[in-house]
Amino acid sequence: MPLTMSQAFIGNFLGNSPKWYKIAILSFLIINPILFFYVSPFVAGWVLVLEFIFTLAMALKCYPLQPGGLLAIEAVAIGMTSANQVLHEIEANLEVLLLLVFMVAGIYFMKQLLLFAFTKIITKVRSKILVSLMFCLTSAFLSAFLDALTVIAVIIAVAVGFYAIYHKVASGKDFSAVHDHTSESNNQLNNSELESFRGFLRNLLMHAGVGTALGGVCTMVGEPQNLIIAAQANWQFGEFVIRMSPVTVPVLIAGILTCLLVEKFRIFGYGAKLPDAVHKILCDYAAHEDAHRTNKDKMKLVIQVLVGVWLIAGLALHLASVGLVGLSVIILTTAFNGITDEHALGKAFEEALPFTALLAVFFAVVAVIIDQHLFAPVIQWALSYEGNTQLVIFYIANGLLSMVSDNVFVGTVYINEVKAALIDGQITRDQFDLLAVAINTGTNLPSVATPNGQAAFLFLLTSALAPLIRLSYGRMVWMALPYTIVLSVVGVLAIETGFLEQATQYFYDSHMIIHHSAKDVIAPLTSH
């Protein structure tokens, strides 16, 4: 029986999403104008924000760009905000968009070097605790300079490679044979060995994922929202690192200790060992690759190392805007490694562009929040407190929202509201700087709780690797739990005890940072 037009419409709308989800989005699109025109723009605005958070929380049912984008288009169409205000938000955050477009693409051309490094870690180090620590710390270091999505993408590529090699050899084939490593019907595989290997890979990926959060919070380029916060506060790379350090350094130490403890006591699904047979296969493969590496291949790795040095130096010394440094990475690696085909270049941009488009939709929702003054009551309540209590409230408020929503969205909303409070004279510039630290750390650290909060976790969960190693949503939340508790508590204690305030005062006295004026925040506003 042929489909009716209405059935065909529902079938096409949002593709393979569940029917209930499609009906929910259509209902939102019908309800919002009614609320806006006949109830209250303020109520309609809050409903839109909750609907948008819902699309982020349901990211596994449907990528949020389409449902979130429809809601944003309707919001502009009915007058909740204007297209000019959306453009203004995008202009103000152009650096973030450039970071996502160029930096992620740039690192795509450095994958060989990163794959080489992680392969050596797994094959040369036999201690599981040491391997876990190295993955966590390496991810943290890389994420301080690179986008967390990029770092996770590299580690996923490493894990898929290892899984494919083991599956191929255990199935009785040699390294060069063509083989489907996703097949579950192979009887030659040792099931207990395979399960142990899956557990081992799950452990490493979770340690690496948390590592990206530990490192990402430390610098202004570690996460997209850091760049937004740094731009609003008018901080450079070095100042951002120094201002965050009273919270980020204790949290980093606590994160490393958590990594050691969960591995040592084999709790929360950690402690899986790499079977000897699997280790031998991986070592044989690494030796095979080393033996067949030509001078041309070696030269490519040398070029990638040199470009990596430029990348870190360029960011640390703020020699150019982050996106432009990323563009230079693309040009240098492709020029000197001979990647000149247009299609080969295009693949590098596939990873980041959907998220870049989604970020533009975030800014449309931020424009609604600004025009309808949605967060004003919450911010006023938080600002009614003083000193450390105010900082703690902002940290917790950011943390709770970041657990269920995307942290770029949360960070952008809160820093905009605090900036408005500074411009209105409700807070001093020094308090604004402390609040920016609380917002940045509150947005980044508790968000490891669920894949909804960390884009890198969501990327991992939706990857082709997750079903192969049996990594489900629930398992990710369970394995992230010890980190969530430790990072959140240590972060809040660093603020609540007054350590952040005291350390910041010491930095002022030592002339490591300077007192800024409120004009530094207002100036970027008037320049658009």
Swiss-Prot record:
The chain crosses the membrane at residues 10-30, 63-83, 96-116, 131-165, 204-224, 240-260, 305-325, 359-379, 391-411, 449-469, 476-496. It comes from the Bacteria. The keyword Magnesium does not apply. It is found in: Cell inner membrane. The keyword Ion transport applies. It is a multi-pass membrane protein. Pfam families: NhaB. Keywords: Antiport, Cell inner membrane, Cell membrane, Ion transport, Membrane, Sodium, Sodium transport, Transmembrane, Transmembrane helix, Transport. GO terms for cellular component: plasma membrane. GO terms for molecular function: sodium:proton antiporter activity. It catalyses: 2 Na(+)(in) + 3 H(+)(out) = 2 Na(+)(out) + 3 H(+)(in). Belongs to the NhaB Na(+)/H(+) (TC 2.A.34) antiporter family. NCBIfam families: NhaB (TIGR00774), PRK09547.1 (NF007093). Na(+)/H(+) antiporter that extrudes sodium in exchange for external protons. This is Na(+)/H(+) antiporter NhaB. It comes from Shewanella putrefaciens (strain CN-32 / ATCC BAA-453).
